[in-house]
């Protein structure tokens, strides 16, 4: 059988010359066939009379299929006859998701430092087991020969069960991510040999799905007469989803051969930031609906008015915009996306006054990043809605307007959340109905030089209904409805120029609401509510744009609006007017 190396380096010196070698960041992936010894990284330094230094750092082995003998994530050997010597195996990882093993004399070693006459250090090495590999041999975290230091070497069993191995030795951390289908009486890891499991001074962590209802779960069991041993320095912690911890929930049973978790431990909700991060999605989605409403009342109604004036019946209109806005919520959420409003408008005249009305369709799609202290979430938001509008324009320039819209929003979320010594990935997707309305009043006045000034005051209401979601980690959350009340006033000038018209504008907006929250519902009936993100506060904007005739019967306009305050960033809008 052949040896397999991700990285392999050997140095031998004579005449008192020092020997130094490092192998870092190498990896090997095996999906089939038969292999002898497998090394993610191998470093060897030998000197007859000088110093010797060998290090294997950050190397990896991925075992996905095949047959193996002995596997090393990283191995360092140092030897000298007269000088000092150091061998370090650090930060190496063996990932096991498949394969079979020649059991007689086989072992899987995360990090091995061999230096019989000097210093040997094996630290921060990891064996991680996923999937359904065949029966495993001896599992060894950090092995040393010489004046050895073995510290913070970890065994991780992730979302799998029914794994068997000979033993688990020289680990200082044990991490169990329980699968959602782990039932009472099933073990995640079973050990066969007579070698006991030493948890003295070790950190043991269990990550349970938030949806788990089994009263008692088996993390580890051993057939060894020596059993599982602990001491006062053993630290056991149980995490439930991303939402909290269970106190005094992990223990070794009366036989001394099973490491168990029971769910009746005292629950402590520690997911304040995590839950608030989940709720940021709802706040961001409501703000995104508000961006769409602004697009319709600014560019959409202007286009509808112009189109209706040139047609005898219903005339189509459209407005499109894009924005990159940061919404301060106590933390913040950054939204990027596009909004579209299309519809038909019709004009009815009473003397010189005009009454405009018609149906509309609105659509938006965007992405977001939310930040709550160290928690960074991201995802997408989409909405689709229909509605109608009415607007009255008088000869003195006064106008009165209103609209009603309703539809559905879809949101998704994903984040890698720090829990204990590791990171837990969680995600969800959900949807919610929404309804929106606005009322506005203003006046358009045209000066003798052709400059048009529009002053307006508009009130916007948006309600995004509450929603529920079960996270990929099993936690069940309810999200409260978001009620947004925004008042916006501003002025816009359209000034004729050679080849077109310059658009300048400014506005002030105040959000009176926009609060939301996330509530965790724990199996058993208890619930815990997150801090509330809020969109409440002042924002201001400055706008500049250009309007020009593209052809004889078509005029286009584009505008850029910069925002500051509670809502910060830039929005871009564009519209087209056809004369029929």
Language model region names:
Residues 3-12, 37-42, 46, 51, ...:
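Glycine-rich beta-solenoid repeat tracts in large extracellular/virion proteins
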Residues 5-10, 24, 29-31, 39-44, ...:
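Feature marks extracellular polysaccharide-active and adherence modules
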Residues 28, 61, 94, 340-342, ...:
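Membrane-embedded beta-strands of outer-membrane beta-barrel proteins
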Residues 118, 124-218:
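Extracellular beta-strand/loop-rich repeat segments of large surface/secreted proteins
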Residues 234-272:
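Low-complexity acidic/polar repeat-biased segments
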Residues 269-453, 559-566, 571:
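Outer membrane beta-barrel translocator domains of Type V secretion systems
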Residues 274, 330-332, 371-379, 410-431, ...:
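Solvent-exposed, glycine/polar-rich loop segments of beta-barrel outer-membrane systems
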Residues 387, 447, 476-580:
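Outer membrane beta-barrel transmembrane domains
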